[in-house]
Amino acid sequence: MADETRRAAAAELRRVHQGLADDGFALTTEWDLGLPPKCAKNLQGTYFDGGRLRHDDGDMPADRERARDVVLYEWHDGKLALEEYETIAIWDRSDIKGERIHQRVALLQDPQAADLIETFLSLVPEQRRQARGTFGINLFRTHSNVVTKPHHDEEDFIILYVLDREGDGAESYLYKHEEGDAETGEQVLRHQLNPGELMIFEDSRFKHGATPLTPPAGGQAKRDVLVCTVDLPTTYLQRATVS
C-alpha cells in the first residue's frame, strides 16, 4: 500500500471511530479503507460463486445459502494475532432453538480474507477493543427477504459488507433501541448498501434489519453479503461459565 493510500486509510479509520463514538454507527467503503481493488468481487468469486455455501434445513429466510467462520484474535501493542477458533456453532439464534453448525470456510487460509478480517477488527475504536476475543464471519446469499424482522444479534459490534447485489431493495435500517417493537423507536438510518460499501454499528444501541429484495425486470434478485460480529465474551470465551 502506497504511503498516500495508507494515510488516507488511516484518516478514514479515524472518521469511522469518531462516527461510532458520536452516533453508534458509521458507513464506509472498501476503497476508503484501502482494501485491494476488486476485493468484494474476489471474495464473491471464491466463496459465493465457488460452491462454498449451502442451505440448511430450517434456516430463515428459507432461500438463504450460507457459510461461516469464527476467528480468535488477540491484540498486542496495536498488532493482531489471528487463529481459527475451535467451533463455529451458534445457539438459540434467529428464533431457532438449540445448536446449529453451518458450513465452515477457513478464511485465514486466504491471505486477502485474513487482511480483510484485520481491517474489520481495526474499525473498532481502541478504547472499545477487547484484548482477546472472537470474531464471527457469516457469508449470506439471499434472494427475497434479507432478514425476517428487526432484531439484535446480542454481540458487541456488527459489520455489514455487501459484495454483490442484483435487483433493488435490501435497504439496511437502524432503530434506536427501545423495549417493544423496533418501529416504536426513532429510525436513525435507512440506506441501501451497494457492492463495496460497509456499515458498522454498536449492536446494543439499535435494532437492525433490511427491507426485502426486489427482483430486476425478468430476473432474480440476489444479495451476497458478509455479516460479521465482534462477539461479546459470553458468545464463546465465557460461554461455559454462563451456561
Each language-model region and where it sits:
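Short, solvent-exposed loop/turn segments at secondary-structure junctions
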Residues: 32-34, 142, 164, 179, ...
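A general structural signal for short secondary-structure junctions and capping/turn motifs
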Residues: 17-19, 62-63, 127-129, 149-151, ...
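Structured loops at beta-to-helix junctions and adjacent beta-edge loops in soluble globular domains
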Residues: 76, 140, 162, 202, ...
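N-terminal auxiliary "cap/dimerization" subdomain that precedes the catalytic jelly-roll/cupin core
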Residues: 1-95
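Generic detector of solvent-exposed, compositionally biased contiguous segments
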Residues: 4-5, 78-79, 126-146, 191-212
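Catalytic core of Fe(II)/2-oxoglutarate
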Residues: 171-243
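Signature of the catalytic double-stranded beta-helix
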Residues: 72-134
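Catalytic core of non-heme Fe(II) oxygenases with the double-stranded beta-helix
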Residues: 129-194
